């Protein structure tokens, strides 16, 4: 049944959603898979670049816990020449809930919504087709199908980006749907049952997660380039989990750990890494920076990179000798020498 999600390649029906008009943008509801015996719809923001000559590349944007479909996120990609669709995969729209105490990250629901994220795979006791991860993955794949059906979009040049739990969804979808030209996951990953921290405590005895839903189980099938974006102080998704997951993927990988990035939705949008990665992959088919070789010579560590763009002449080594959960370790920055062969 999980593999069937990858067959949702036909464009879903969709309709305009109510709300104040925004120039160059559309609020929409797109049809998704049934839940509890009834049809569901997914709220989304859809936007195209204002200035374009012919079809443009595209990207599907997937929020994390406490998030929704973000108009601003779509606009940021539109400004860079991409068509974009940002989905709300928990049966919500982008209006904050008026109930006191629910202002922080809680959103008004709509009548066609599917399941909401409940705990850490907390609905694993439900039938597969009733679970949140099933519906979030389906909505993501269907959003890609919708975007690919638009004449303004290059159907074979559509990427995928997820933040936090949206990154988990992105990693899950990457292993099920081979159409994405690239995948960017901020924070979220697989190996949550064996990477330490709060997620391991919640999932180490969850047999369904360990044998079916952990993204790493099928990630070798994902041949598209992938970027994993995080930071050393990340408290939710262990860097051990992130590293393990990236090593399972079947295509070119790039990891970017940004000191003091912080965990949230805007933080990855405001960084250049995701945009540079997407542009490079669509231009060359590869990440712009790749590790070619690592070596140890006594107390000296050497890393060789292949890059298709100039590197900052300042280099530092960020390291730790601590044990335990990676987000709680003390990390040290040490100066490093950078020498290059011209790009």
Task: Report the location of each language-model feature.
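N-terminal cap/lid segment of alpha/beta-hydrolase-fold proteins
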Residues: 4-54, 305-307, 337-339
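Short beta-strand element of the alpha/beta-hydrolase
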Residues: 43, 54-64, 75, 84
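Cap/lid segment of the alpha/beta-hydrolase catalytic domain
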Residues: 75-137, 189-201
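Primarily recognizes the serine-hydrolase "nucleophile elbow" in alpha/beta-hydrolase
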Residues: 141-208
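The feature captures the conserved acid-bearing segment of alpha/beta-hydrolase catalytic domains
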Residues: 194-248
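Catalytic histidine neighborhood in serine/cysteine hydrolases
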Residues: 249-265
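Surface beta-strand/loop "capping" patches
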Residues: 269, 276-319, 335-342
């Amino acid at each position: 049944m999980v593999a069937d999600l990858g067959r949702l390649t036909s464009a879903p029906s969709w309709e305009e959603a109510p709300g104040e008009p925004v120039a160059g943008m559309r609020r929409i509801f797109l049809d998704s898979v049934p839940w509890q015996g009834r049809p569901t719809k997914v709220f989304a923001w859809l936007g195209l670049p204002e200035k374009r000559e012919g079809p443009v590349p595209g990207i599907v944007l997937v929020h994390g816990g406490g998030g929704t479909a973000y108009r601003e996120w779509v606009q940021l990609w539109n400004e860079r020449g991409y068509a974009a669709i940002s989905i709300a995969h928990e049966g919500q729209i982008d209006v904050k809930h008026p109930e006191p105490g629910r202002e922080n990250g809680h959103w008004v629901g709509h009548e066609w919504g599917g399941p909401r994220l409940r705990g850490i795979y907390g609905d694993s006791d439900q039938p597969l087709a009733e679970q949140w991860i099933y519906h979030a993955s389906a909505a993501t794949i269907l959003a890609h199908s919708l975007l690919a059906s638009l004449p303004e979009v290059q159907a074979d040049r559509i990427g995928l980006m997820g933040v936090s739990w949206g990154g988990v969804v992105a990693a899950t979808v990457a292993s099920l749907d081979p159409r994405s030209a690239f995948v960017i996951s901020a924070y979220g990953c697989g190996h949550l049952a064996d990477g330490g921290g709060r997620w391991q405590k919640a999932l180490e005895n969850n047999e369904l997660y360990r044998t079916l839903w952990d993204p790493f189980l099928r990630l070798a099938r994902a041949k598209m380039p992938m970027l994993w974006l995080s930071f050393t102080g990340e408290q939710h998704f262990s860097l051990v989990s992130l590293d393990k997951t990236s090593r399972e993927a079947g295509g070119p990988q790039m990891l970017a750990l940004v000191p003091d990035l912080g965990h949230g939705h805007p933080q990855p949008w405001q960084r250049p890494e995701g945009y540079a990665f997407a542009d490079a992959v669509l231009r060359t088919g590869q990440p712009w920076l790749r590790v070619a070789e690592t070596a140890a010579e006594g107390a000296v560590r050497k890393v060789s990179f292949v890059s298709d763009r100039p590197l900052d002449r300042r280099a530092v080594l960020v390291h730790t000798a601590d044990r335990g959960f990676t987000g709680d370790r003390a990390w040290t920055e040490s100066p490093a020498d950078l020498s290059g062969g011209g790009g």
